A protein has these predicted regions:
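Catalytic cores of nucleotide-sugar-dependent glycosyltransferases that transfer UDP/GDP/TDP-activated
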Residues: 1-136
């Protein structure tokens, strides 16, 4: 199984003191429609970067709405993460000449196949938040 980030349940009501337009009530109402949904966010690291900064508070808030949300982290060897760092930078406009290197696709696919084999099939929805596990 993939590593599951340990998080608790948040309290959406604490935001009522700063929100005055009824948005919390709307979020709670929309959450009723999703109550019980099994949702898994997947990314490559639990620390640093925008995804981790968002999910650390977002997952507990989803749970406070009754959504069975989890956050899991993929595994990969050093070469996989070097290659996918290049993908990440290329998506932001940097050149990525390594794409032509022999075996790059094989390393990427092999690591993602290993991770795919560790996915828990008991989720209704998977959200992939990084280019590293995009092939899942």
């Amino acid at each position: 199984m993939l590593h599951k980030v340990s998080l608790g349940v948040g309290n959406i009501d604490k935001y009522r003191t700063i929100e005055t337009r009824g948005l919390i009530d709307e979020i709670v109402s929309l959450g009723e429609e999703l109550k019980g949904l099994r949702l898994c966010h997947i990314n490559s690291t639990p620390f640093g970067g925008g995804v981790a900064e968002l999910l650390v508070s977002y997952i507990p808030l989803l749970r406070s709405l009754g959504i069975k949300a989890d956050w899991q982290i993929i595994r990969g060897d050093r070469r996989f993460f070097t290659i996918t760092k290049g993908f990440h930078n290329a998506l932001q406009g940097a050149p990525f000449d390594e794409i032509k290197k022999e075996g790059l696709k094989r390393v990427y696919q092999s690591n993602n196949l290993t991770n795919a084999g560790e996915l828990d099939p008991n989720y209704d929805v998977f959200i992939v938040n990084d280019p590293q596990p995009a092939a899942l």
